[in-house]
Amino acid sequence: MSHLQYTAKSHLRNFKTRIFRDEQADISFNSAKQMWFYGFKLHMLVSLSGYVVNDLVTPASTHDSKACEELLEDTNFPMILADLGYISQSLKQRLAQKGYQLWTPLRQNMSEAKHHNNWKLMAKRRTIETRFSVLCTEFDIQRPLVRSLCGLELWLESIIWVYNLRFFN
């Protein structure tokens, strides 16, 4: 079982908007923080133990469900716990054809939310959310100090590599 997660990447200042203008960065709304941001999104596939299995950087306006299938390439996790951003019936059907079972919690105002949102699965998601916040607090991944998309990807890969070293004693 693994978890699919994303974070909004960087609230770029005015001088950085010029740097990333040719690099696919764009604007999007982060509904969790109720704010607009300019930059990229980092999507990650994380095991239940917190090990980062795969990651993908997309422009900020890319819908989460579009990144999902690319993240799952070359993985063998049959059960995927995902964020609310990955709610899509068509995505669920496409992944089912490939042998994946996608579970996303329902929003509280959706019908059947109380029956669908299993507390055990929600607890597993919470554990992984905690691991994800470690990347934000210890490595400050939401404020990259890079000057290109290639630099951003290299910077993230090095952080994820160092983070994953914790799982090997």
Where are the language model's segments positioned?
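Polybasic low-complexity intrinsically disordered regions
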Residues: 1-107
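Structural motif
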Residues: 32-35, 145-156
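A residue-level signal for conserved active-site and pocket-lining positions in enzyme catalytic cores
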Residues: 44, 129, 161
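Short helix-capping/linker segments at secondary-structure and domain boundaries
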Residues: 51, 163-169
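A general structural signal for well-ordered alpha-helical segments in protein cores
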Residues: 65-68, 132, 158
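Helix-centered, glycine/charged polyanion-binding patches within enzymatic domains
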Residues: 79, 84-150
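Charged alpha-helix within mobile-element recombinases
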Residues: 135, 153-162
